[in-house]
Amino acid sequence: MLTDEYIKRVYDQVVARDGDQPEFLQAVREVFETLQPVVEKHPEYEKAGVLERIVEPERTIKFRVAWVDDEGKVQVNRGYRIQFNSAIGPYKGGLRFHPTVTESVVKFLGFEQILKNSLTTLPMGGGKGGSDFNPKGKSDAEVMRFCQAFMTELSRHIGQFTDVPAGDINVGGREIGYLFGQYKRIRDEYSGVLTGKGLEFGGSLARTEATGYGVCYYTQEALRVLRNDSFEGKTVVISGSGNVATYAAQKAEQLGAKVVTVSDSNGYIYDPNGINVEVVKQIKEVERGRIKEYAERVPGSEYHEGSKGVWTVKGDIALPCATQNEVDGESAQKLVDNGVTVVVEGANMPSTPEAIEVYQKNGVLYGPAKAANAGGVAVSGLEMSQNSYRLSWTFEEVDAKLKSIMEEIVANSLAAAKEYDHEGDLMLGANAAGFVKVANAMVAQGVL
């Protein structure tokens, strides 16, 4: 509930202006509800209009993307780039290619990115972009032509010191390669304008694994500090089968857990013997197939239709790694009833407000997305550093830096929670720690 007058006034203004953007409103309200003790302690934020400014993007770019498919037909999609806040560094955030991409979705992701990037302690502002283009079922040539058309417009708005996009859902190494090539051709320059690049042309080792590994490093540290516990011997329920889910499963198993599920938009796999990550990688990364094929290849595993069913599986730890709002209140209650005591988010905003309420009422250790899945953008920041230095670090060096960053995020979140009288609250702590750094920078730089 919003009780602070300043916060309530600003939120009402956001609703009046952006009432047709439900995902964005949800993200803003979740953050605002936890910022009330922060705003009360810092009256200078109201005087400087920090809340009014932080919820309004510095720039919203929306454009047509016209391209030709393999049959010679002209196709038209929408492209977006939200340059949300540059108070602590150049805009930084991924590109998502998915039919569900709208201005509201990109805006909520960009808003979350401001605080997420702040939490990494690296100098990166918040941004996000994408298109309603769906690469699934498209040939490599069609994906290439779309990426080239998309970058033809985007190239005039980005740069290594201005805005550095990365990948997100359906934007992996293939797409980043096509986008980077087109930027290089148009701008006639070779720079670190994108992250998630191939190792042959400026990418970083451990970038592919970063988000999933980071989720597990965060979870392991939160368990250690708050419960004197670890992944060892735990049963883990994971949703999704993309980059984040796959490498979260891999790292959880390395840390001694047994991962029993993965899913996609059609259904989920239950493997009581533990998910074989190499089979998942072969199906999803190499063959670009559907997860149901796992059951055809791994004896003893089961495929079930309906992705929401994954939350009915018994476990100790749940890592939602698929998409926004995948866990509603009913699903959260099923998780609790099935013994889950830890929920850490790998996807962006995968839990609805009702689900978060269930976690809090039942004493679930809850790690919010903006903190827990910051590993991807953290290693993107490390890739930017390597590009600037014109050198490459080893996998072990990058992985060690990632682990240190995730442990620092837990420590900073808990310190902020304690400072604002909500000891142990990782959600309030993450929002407060991320916000205060950006807010102080905004105050120092004047009204912009």
Where are these regions (language model features)?
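N-terminal cap/recognition module
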Residues: K73-I114
